Amino acid sequence: MPEFIWRSVLILQASTAIYTAGPAFWGLVNSAWNLCTIGKRQSPININTSQIIFDPFLPPLRLTMEGKKVSGTMINTGRHVIFRLDKQNPVNISGGPLLYNHRLEEIMLHFGSENGIGSEHFMNKESAAGEVQLIHYNQDLYNNVSEASRNPNGLAIISLFINVADNSNPFLNRMLNRETITRISFRNEANFIQDLSIEELYPESFGFLTYQGSMTIPPCYETVTWIIIDRPLNITSMQMHSLRLLSQNQPSQIFQSMSDNFRPVQPLFHRGLRGNLDFRKPGRKCKGANYKLHVDRLMSSKNLD
């Protein structure tokens, strides 16, 4: 099995036709995907803020990096835009609800054909224009993301909503500028990008909520700790338009936009939602609302100036 199950639309050797049949059919067309249909801890979900339990003991998130910048490859998979980090400067996340260190493997973008849809998670039954998902695997217990995805406490996904505005988040601005995005217009095209700062994806201060869920693509393993950041990332309307011009197909095939690449929300059932601030009282400033990302740098000789 390939090391990284997120890397291809042809997950578990499924054909593109089967995958694109739609999320409602995933559990029916492939027995290996039955959790997509019968699972009780599926993602994404609608987040009802009145159901979030305030947990003042949730610690801040902690980012551990080797060096100041990262590099990686931006890829049009035919289904998603992903940024896959190289292995030279690993980035780990810990803290919050996480009991282990998790290594950042890749960043995935979801977006809609209109600004009123696009995110996978909903907040009080409202969608955002898109969602950025930072996908990490438990490096303390597992050797790679493929192994981790199948096992308990395997994955941690940090999610940030996308908002269309007049300005753009610096990290996303590098990913979505015209020179970069036009190089991945069609399926399987890729472009190498270097000198990006992961810290720029996180707001200066923020709150978060967390719950136990699943991957949002087949085989929908229920091994994910989700961490949803409460403050969105901005991109411009032109950058969103450029995303919608990305094709699911190759140049010789009929154009089909990659937009609306999100899974519908799934039932919450009896799962609990926790947050480091009281989402039920948006006007009240509590300790969690001022959390900042803690960053530790592990400088190696190759990163010294």
Protein language model features and the residues they cover:
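Alpha-carbonic anhydrase
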Residues: M1-D305
